[in-house]
């Protein structure tokens, strides 16, 4: 964290032109930011200023954003508030999870960084200030937040399933057991009481939400690996009978 005088001196002794940070997640003292001749830059996993802070990938899926990307920014004393040097984007597919987006951004980030470093070396990098009015705080995820509220819109729940995969995993209770949802789709249909199972077969477990129906396709019961709904119903059909109210 470069807080000690010894660490700061070691950094100064490097006589570095530039420092690059990736997924660092901590604020740097101004003295450290000023040590390299060209300052410090960071590879941030979103299109700034849309999502700042801890969980930009998950929040972009959760919010239903059409695209995400990486931003190479000049670091300042704030958290993800520095001037933008380069932005690279890619679409968020309707099947993308946080896990799949991490993999895509892990490829995009180094490419954008190399391009940005070339621009800096050539004196072509143009810093662009962020519009704070467009910024959102991508707070850390929690297990409590991942619990499904069946009164929510089905499309929103489906996005949460993808955003919270692989952690903390969207979940609900059935027969007093916590069930993790690995995959689901949503449908727009006339509905009854939220949380009610209206169909359960090899095609999925159909659950009424506040708006539409969520079709559960892959679940995980306590002590087991994630399984298809067909396999779940073969052994635990009583947990998911039509008319059952999930909580």
Curated annotation (Swiss-Prot):
Query: Keywords, A to Z?
Result: Protein biosynthesis, Transferase
Enzyme Commission code: 2.1.2.9
Q: Which reaction does it catalyse?
A: L-methionyl-tRNA(fMet) + (6R)-10-formyltetrahydrofolate = N-formyl-L-methionyl-tRNA(fMet) + (6S)-5,6,7,8-tetrahydrofolate + H(+)
Give a yes or no for keyword Transferase in this entry.
yes
The keyword Protein biosynthesis belongs to this UniProt entry's keyword annotation? yes
What GO terms are given for molecular function? methionyl-tRNA formyltransferase activity
Q: Which InterPro entries match?
A: Fmt, Formyl_trans_C, Formyl_trans_C_sf, Formyl_transf_N, Formyl_transf_N_sf, Formyl_transferase-like_C_sf, GART_AS, Met-tRNA-FMT_C
Gene Ontology cellular-component terms for this entry are: cytosol
Spell out the SUPFAM superfamilies in the cross-references: FMT C-terminal domain-like, Formyltransferase
> Which domain of life does this protein belong to?
Bacteria
Task: Identify the enzyme class.
Answer: transferase
For this chain, the family text in UniProt reads:
Belongs to the Fmt family.
Family matches, as PANTHER family: METHIONYL-TRNA FORMYLTRANSFERASE, METHIONYL-TRNA FORMYLTRANSFERASE, MITOCHONDRIAL
Role of this protein: Attaches a formyl group to the free amino group of methionyl-tRNA(fMet). The formyl group appears to play a dual role in the initiator identity of N-formylmethionyl-tRNA by promoting its recognition by IF2 and preventing the misappropriation of this tRNA by the elongation apparatus.
Q: What is this protein called?
A: Methionyl-tRNA formyltransferase
By which gene is this protein encoded? fmt
């Amino acid at each position: 964290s470069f807080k000690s005088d010894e660490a700061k001196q070691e950094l100064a002794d490097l006589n570095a032109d530039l420092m690059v940070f990736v997924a660092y997640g901590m604020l740097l003292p101004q003295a450290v930011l000023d040590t390299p001749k060209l300052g410090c830059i960071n590879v941030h996993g979103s299109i700034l200023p849309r999502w700042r802070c801890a969980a930009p990938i998950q929040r972009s899926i959760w919010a239903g954003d059409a695209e995400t990307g990486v931003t190479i920014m000049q670091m300042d004393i704030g958290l993800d508030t520095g001037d933008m040097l380069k932005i690279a984007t890619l679409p968020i597919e309707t099947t993308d999870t946080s896990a799949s987006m991490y993999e895509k951004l892990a490829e995009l980030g180094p490419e954008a960084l190399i391009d940005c470093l070339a621009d800096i070396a050539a004196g072509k990098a143009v810093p662009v200030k962020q519009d704070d009015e467009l910024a959102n705080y991508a707070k850390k995820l929690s297990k409590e937040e991942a619990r499904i509220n069946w009164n929510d819109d089905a499309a929103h729940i489906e996005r949460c399933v993808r955003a919270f995969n692989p952690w903390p995993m969207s979940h609900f209770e059935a027969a007093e057991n916590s069930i993790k949802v690995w995959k689901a789709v949503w449908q727009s249909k006339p509905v009854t009481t939220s949380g009610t199972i209206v169909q359960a077969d090899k095609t999925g477990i159909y659950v009424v939400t506040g708006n539409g129906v969520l079709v559960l396709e892959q679940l995980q019961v306590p002590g087991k690996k994630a399984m298809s709904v067909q396999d779940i119903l073969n052994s635990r059909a009583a947990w998911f009978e039509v008319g059952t109210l999930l909580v």
